[in-house]
């Protein structure tokens, strides 16, 4: 696979900080999009030139999630921070025709997490209200998906600048939040 675009998500930060253990010199990144340059002799699903993107949990195909199926590329095997990568045919899926490589590379983790929360689990309907917290990838995808479904989206952030960005993406009423941690009592 020739990697044309990759994206960073919270999982990649956790790996970089050592909070998800990996082998030394592991190539990071779990989300990418690219073009197939070669296929193995037993590959039947893909052909040279196909435009594909990574899958968040390539080992979880169906059914309830099980711990041993929830491993990521980028922690238990080398990831997409490379120009070329050899991966199993089950670890990728077709890029929708309306997306370019950069757009598709952002979908696998954050985009599908938002979709699962709002659509698969939440059964979101037009006219409902959704709260998104902060400006991370999942929140931004959730905001845009919810607006597409006709929902009102209330967004929160601790930054006025970030709230302006959320408004530009379609957030309705927004709320500025500032966390004040309690101090130790002197009594």
Where are these regions (language model features)?
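Glycine-rich beta-strand-centered segment in the early N-terminal region that forms part
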Residues: 1-6, 16-61, 76-79, 96-98
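Alpha-helix/helix-capping structural signal
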Residues: 6-8, 41, 90, 112
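Cytochrome P450 core scaffold surrounding the K-helix E-X-X-R motif
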Residues: 11-13
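NAD(P)H dinucleotide-binding glycine-rich loop of Rossmann-like/cofactor-binding domains
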Residues: 56-133
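Mid-domain Rossmann-like dinucleotide-binding core that forms the NAD(H)/NADP(H) cofactor-binding site
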Residues: 102-176
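Conserved small/polar residues in nucleotide/adenosyl-binding loops
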Residues: 177-183
